[in-house]
Amino acid sequence: MKKYFYLLAAMFVAVLSTSCLESGLEELDEYSGCDITNGNVYWRYYGDGKNPASGEQEVKQVYLAAARTQDVDNCVYTIRYTTSNIPEAERANFTESKAVVAVTISTAATIKPINGAPKLGVPGDWTKDNQYEVTAADGTKKTWTIVVEPYN
């Protein structure tokens, strides 16, 4: 019983010694960055094997990005891809209308598709330029155009 009393007393002291300071705290700046800083193109396809955990057919993913350019003034991010990483047997099945694009954006920013653009990170139609609204933590917004094209 004595042990429980000491444990309860220790918890009581711990709760009372914490602070509920609500004023005099340093104001921190919110991030104002709303840029696309990196981008990648991937191709996903079904492999021959089975996933041992689920028993489903395995899904393979191949990295395709070869070059990137960022035009901050015009808010255009271009990703050029090469299909040389795709296995020869699968290469004929590649189409931009089912490519997967993933991007990195400024710290604490959010991104959402606009004007019918596909969601990022899942297969989507990249045969056309797509627009995304990037919102910084401080509320600043920019509309970015992502262009996916073959690398020549």
Name these PLM-found stretches.
Residues 7-13:
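Sec-dependent N-terminal signal peptides
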Residues 20-152:
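Beta-rich interaction/scaffold domains
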Residues 15-19:
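C-terminal motif of bacterial Sec signal peptides marking the signal peptidase cleavage site
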Residues 1-5, 22:
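Positively charged n-region of N-terminal signal peptides that target proteins for export
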